[in-house]
Amino acid sequence: MPTFVDPSKCDGCKGGEKTACMYICPNDLMILDPEEMKAFNQEPEACWECYSCIKICPQGAITARPYADFAPMGGTCIPLRGSEDIMWTIKFRNGSVKRFKFPIRTTPEGSIKPFEGKPEAGDLENELLFTETALTVPQVALGQKAQIADAETSQCWFDLPCEGGNR
């Protein structure tokens, strides 16, 4: 569902150098027409369909044209974003309207602690990665030989010398 700008609603973010939709578009598709001072999607086929431009537009000038299997040709999708949820309004070409409301977040903002319980970063001399913990050799296995079928010599942990000269 690529996005389209309604020129009658777009005010070019009050004549600024960069509109909100230009700022937020990850694919740099939204541009400002310097003559009319209206934003538009320069390549709708390349739209990633993230709908960031729709959600950020202060005038509600950007809409998504839904795929035919979702809403028949001529329909539009319009979001209304609140602080806790987003409501999508689907206008069908016959005039009927349906609304769907979804939460924006399922966890309180700031409640996720991704590095909790992880070691402190900054030890560049450590051979372990940031998230790795040191692995130790099991005490039971130290000094015991591990028999490997069809091997010429037996192998053991490297803490003690192995018989047969292999290390």
From Swiss-Prot:
Q: Which GO terms describe its biological process?
A: dissimilatory sulfate reduction; protein heterotetramerization
The entry's localization annotation reads:
Cytoplasm
Q: For [4Fe-4S] cluster 1, which residues are the binding ones?
A: C10, C13, C21, C57
So where does [4Fe-4S] cluster 2 get bound?
C25, C47, C50, C53
Keyword ATP-binding assigned to the entry: answer is: no
Alphabetized, the UniProt keywords read: 4Fe-4S, Cytoplasm, Electron transport, Iron, Iron-sulfur, Metal-binding, Transport
Q: How does activity depend on pH?
A: Optimum pH is 7.4 for the adenylylsulfate reductase.
| Cellular component annotations (GO), alphabetically ordered | cytoplasm
MF terms from GO for this chain are:
4 iron, 4 sulfur cluster binding; metal ion binding; protein heterodimerization activity
- In this chain, the site described as Important for interaction with AprA at the substrate channel entrance is at E152, D159, E163
Cofactor(s) this protein requires: [4Fe-4S] cluster
Q: What InterPro entries does the database record attribute to this sequence?
A: 4Fe4S_Fe-S-bd, 4Fe4S_Fe_S_CS, AprB, AprB_C, APS_reduc_Bsu_C_sf, Fe-S_Ferredoxin
Record-linked Pfam families = APS-reductase_C, Fer4_7
4Fe-4S ferredoxin-type domain sequence ranges: 1-35, 38-67
| Principal location | cytoplasm
The record's comment on cofactor binding reads: Binds 2 [4Fe-4S] clusters.
Share what the entry says about its subunit structure, partners included: Heterodimer composed of AprA and AprB. The heterodimers can dimerize to form heterotetramers.
**What does the domain comment read?**
Consists of three sections from the N- to the C-terminus: [4Fe-4S] cluster-binding domain, beta-sheet and C-terminal tail. The beta-sheet and the C-terminal tail interact with AprA to stabilize the AprA/AprB heterodimer.
Q: What is this protein called?
A: Adenylylsulfate reductase subunit beta
Organism of origin is Megalodesulfovibrio gigas (strain ATCC 19364 / DSM 1382 / NCIMB 9332 / VKM B-1759) (Desulfovibrio gigas)
Q: Which gene encodes it?
A: aprB
